[in-house]
């Protein structure tokens, strides 16, 4: 039997199964930033908050009024860990004080300068901004996968950047050819 690398879910989407009852993850689509022997880290990308970039900028640079377009840039709940910490997924190309290039032509930036750049019209134009992240201890995500808590879907930048937040979960499921309303809550193991 071929051994699967423990990082096999990095740069994939996790689709919460319909029977997921954890309020932090029920009906979520999560982008997996990292998955290795030490655990996993991801960002929920379909949970918009009532908070906007304008609200965040009011806290970060209160001396400057936020540009009007910032009222239309929604902040998402990225997960239950460190909910005061910001993360921005965006296409690769621009780098900021704290930017990590990820597979598939996307980057993750965590410094305030990315927010200022978006606000000031210098981009990145395509972005998903989250507060908080989802974290799993070593083996925890693997165990949840074995318990059928999640489906996995290969990454598609169109789902991340071109699909409205409230449609991302269904778009990822459609990519697999699945209607989440028709999935059984019971599964067997051969």
From Swiss-Prot:
Gene3D superfamilies: VC0467-like. It comes from the Bacteria. SUPFAM superfamilies: VC0467-like. One of its GO terms (cellular component) is cytosol. Disulfide bonds: none annotated. Belongs to the UPF0301 (AlgH) family. This is UPF0301 protein Psyr_0485. It comes from Pseudomonas syringae pv. syringae (strain B728a).
């Amino acid at each position: 039997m071929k051994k699967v690398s423990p990082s096999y879910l990095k740069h994939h989407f996790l689709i919460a199964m319909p029977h997921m009852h954890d309020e932090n993850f029920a009906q979520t689509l999560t982008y997996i930033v990292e998955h290795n022997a030490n655990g996993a880290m991801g960002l929920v990308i379909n949970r918009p908050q009532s908070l906007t970039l304008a609200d965040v900028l009011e806290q970060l640079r209160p001396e400057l009024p936020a540009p009007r377009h910032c009222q239309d840039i929604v902040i998402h709940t990225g997960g239950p860990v460190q909910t005061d910490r910001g993360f921005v997924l965006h296409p690769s190309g621009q780098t900021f004080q704290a930017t990590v290039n990820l597979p598939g032509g996307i980057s993750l930036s965590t410094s305030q300068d990315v927010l200022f750049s978006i606000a000031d019209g210098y981009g990145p134009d395509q972005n998903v901004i989250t507060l908080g992240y989802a974290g799993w201890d070593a083996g925890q995500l693997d165990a949840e996968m074995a318990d059928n808590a999640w489906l996995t879907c290969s990454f598609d930048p169109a789902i991340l950047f071109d699909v409205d937040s409230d449609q991302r979960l269904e778009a990822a499921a459609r990519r697999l050819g699945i209607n989440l309303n028709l999935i059984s809550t019971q599964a067997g193991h051969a």
